[in-house]
Every structure is written in structure tokens, then in C-alpha cells.
UniProtKB/Swiss-Prot annotation:
This is Flagellar assembly protein FliH. The keyword Protein biosynthesis does not apply. NCBIfam families: PRK05687.1-1. The gene is fliH. Residues 1-22 are annotated as: Disordered. Needed for flagellar regrowth and assembly. It comes from the Bacteria.
Length: 235
């Protein structure tokens, strides 16, 4: 059997469908190129797009305006707070620096016032002394002296009789002796006082001598007392 086929191994047929060949589908009458213009929008779409852009712009403007205003307000507030704080610190520092100066000025004013008060007292005392000295000069040069003051002085001494014991002796200037005798002789005798003339006394003065001591009412003594009262600490 020479015409017989050679021996081959049997294999089953492939049951999978045959692969399809991809053929690009071309759109009918449509050619896409880079220069192809975009499709035109309708009026409604254009309006919506413009509104969206306006909203975006308004949002950006509002944000920028708010940011600028916030910065400005913050700057102004910071400036005012800094100014107030600086002013307060400056005032406190100025008060601290001026406190010693103010205290020194108060001390100077007080010392100046005390000086004026002392000067006023000295001036018044000096004027009083000058007036008393002028009066003494006038009285010393006057030939006639009014004895009314001496009479009143002796009457006051008589009212102080309980201060004297025994028989007090009243001495006056010899030129005043007659006037005192005429005015108070009887009263002096009634009280047991003795009247004597003393040339060492000035006109208008008198002295009372008793067991307890002397009471000096002479012009010289009264003059010294007036000067002492007019200028305390000087005499």
C-alpha cells in the first residue's frame, strides 16, 4: 500500500472564533483638525458663562477689598494702641523725672514764704522800735508832760494792794509829786501808802517798794518791755 498517507497525530480543531480585523470607522463627512472651530454657544449659555465670570471677579474683588480694609483697620488700630501706650509711658516717665524737681520747687516756695514771714516780722519790729524811739525823743524834749497816764497807773497799783504788805512806798519823779498828791493823796493815806519823790525816775513813771519787793512801773522799764514785745528775742 504505497499510496497510503503517512501516520500523523490527530489534534482537535480550534473552537475559538477567528480574530476580527479592526477597521477604523470614519465619521461621515466629519474631519477633525486643529483648526476646527469650537461649536458656537447659545445666548443662554453665553449669559451663564458671563454671570459665572462676573461672580468670580466679584468674589476676587470683595476678597481683595476686605483684605485691604482689614489690613488698614489693623494698622490704624495698632497705631492708635501704640500711640496711646507710648503716650502713657511718656507721661509716667515725665512724672517720675519731674517728681524731684516738683518737690524741690515746693521746698523753695516754702522756704521763701518763711523768709517773707520772718522779714515781715522783722520789719514790723523795726518800725515799732523806730516809732517808740521817736516818741521817746519827743516826750524827752517836751517841757510839760500829761500826768493822766501816771494817775491811772497808780490807781491800778492801788487795786493790787493785797500784793503788798506793811506800808508800801510809792515813788514818783519830783515834778510829778505835787500832781499825784493833789489827785491821789487822800486815797494813798487811806491805804497806808507813803508818797516820795525820786529824781532817778523819768516823768510819768513810778515804783512801789514793799516788804515783798519792788514793782517797777518806771518809764524806762515800760519802754524796755514795749521793745521786747515789739521785737521778741532781740532785747
Amino acid at each position: 500500500m504505497s499510496n497510503e498517507l503517512p501516520w500523523q497525530v490527530w489534534t482537535p480543531d480550534d473552537l475559538a472564533p477567528p480574530p476580527e480585523t479592526f477597521v477604523p470607522v470614519e465619521a461621515d463627512n466629519v474631519t477633525l483638525t486643529e483648526d476646527t472651530p469650537e461649536p458656537e454657544l447659545t445666548a443662554e449659555q453665553q449669559l451663564e458663562q458671563e454671570l459665572a465670570q462676573l461672580k468670580i471677579q466679584a468674589h476676587e474683588q470683595g476678597y481683595n477689598a476686605g483684605l485691604a480694609e482689614g489690613r488698614q483697620k489693623g494698622h490704624a488700630q495698632g497705631y492708635q494702641e501704640g500711640l496711646a501706650q507710648g503716650l502713657e509711658q511718656g507721661q509716667a516717665q515725665a512724672q517720675t523725672q519731674q517728681a524731684p524737681i516738683h518737690a524741690r520747687m515746693q521746698q523753695l516756695v516754702s522756704e521763701f514764704q518763711n523768709t517773707l514771714d520772718a522779714l515781715d516780722s522783722v520789719i514790723a519790729s523795726r518800725l515799732m522800735q523806730m516809732a517808740l524811739e521817736a516818741a521817746r525823743q519827743v516826750i524827752g524834749q517836751t517841757p510839760a508832760v500829761d500826768n493822766s497816764a501816771l494817775i491811772k497807773q497808780i490807781q491800778q497799783l492801788l487795786q493790787q494792794e493785797p500784793l503788798f504788805s506793811g506800808k508800801p512806798q510809792l515813788r514818783v519823779h519830783p515834778d510829778d509829786l505835787q500832781r499825784v498828791e493833789e489827785m491821789l493823796g487822800a486815797t494813798l493815806s487811806l491805804h497806808g501808802w507813803r508818797l516820795r519823790g525820786d529824781p532817778t525816775l523819768h516823768h510819768g513813771g513810778c515804783k512801789v517798794s514793799a516788804d515783798e519787793g519792788d514793782l517797777d512801773a518806771s518809764v524806762a522799764t515800760r519802754w524796755q518791755e514795749l521793745c521786747r514785745l515789739a521785737a521778741p528775742g532781740v532785747l
